[in-house]
Amino acid sequence: MAALFADDPRCGSASGGNGAAWRVICATQVLGIVGRRMILYFLDLVGVAVFAVSGVLAARSRGVDLLGVLVIAAITAIGGGTLRDLLLNRYPIFWITDAQYLTVIIASALLTVGYVRVRPPPGNALLVADAFGLALFALSGAQVAEAAQCPPIIVVLMGTMTGVAGGVLRDVITAQVPLILRRDIYATAAIVGVAFYLLLQAFGLQRSQAFGGGMVVVVALRLLAIRWGLHCC
């Protein structure tokens, strides 16, 4: 780990007292960064799993076979992120270099298929699963755009697109009217959530805290819209 901050002049020599103190501080900062990245990576995988579940539930209503279910689950889960990476010229595409994404998609899809054979899901299960997937992907997409040093308006756009594109592809493939084209509060929830995430950072909150705040806004808006039938117009 020393190599990560060996060039920092504040860390001094290993034998100096001040150098040792700075090394402890630097090590703590590095561990904090690694920890935050691991948490965000885990949340990204959770988002993939949730969107894969929503893809299975949508495919189930169309009576497709198991291969079709897996394809729809995968397109739903990675469609938005793939489009984001292409537009940001971010290569290789995130799921090509990390097999964990496809593993999570397949496992989530198969578990969901097995579950719905035993117990039919609640009527709003697809919408609720989609709400959590939308929140996770919108915020993770925003962070990718931030890392690419995009201006705030592009961060909002990329976050929203990452969140909604997979669901749009899912609905088109299963011959449904995409949620983004209905009167429901959908893309609006992603836009407001990502904007709130940026606003929290502007007020001095850490990125991980702002991430949580943005997620809460997206999920809350979607669940309120589902529960009370709220519309944009």
Please give the residue ranges for each predicted region.
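Cytoplasmic-side transmembrane-helix entry/capping segments in multi-pass membrane proteins
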Residues: 67-75, 98-102, 123-133, 158, ...
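Short, structured motif recognition centered on aromatic/hydrophobic residues
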Residues: 71-75, 82-88, 157, 161, ...
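Ordered, amphipathic secondary-structure segments that act as subunit-interaction surfaces
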Residues: 107-144
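Helix-coil boundary and interhelical linker segments in multi-pass alpha-helical membrane proteins
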Residues: 37-40, 86-96, 140-154, 200-209
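Structural signature of hydrophobic alpha-helical transmembrane segments
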Residues: 38-48, 93-107, 151-163
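C-terminal ends of transmembrane helices
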Residues: 53-62, 85-86, 110-123, 168-178, ...
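Small-residue-rich segments of transmembrane alpha-helices in multi-pass membrane proteins
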Residues: 73-79, 129-143, 161, 185-198
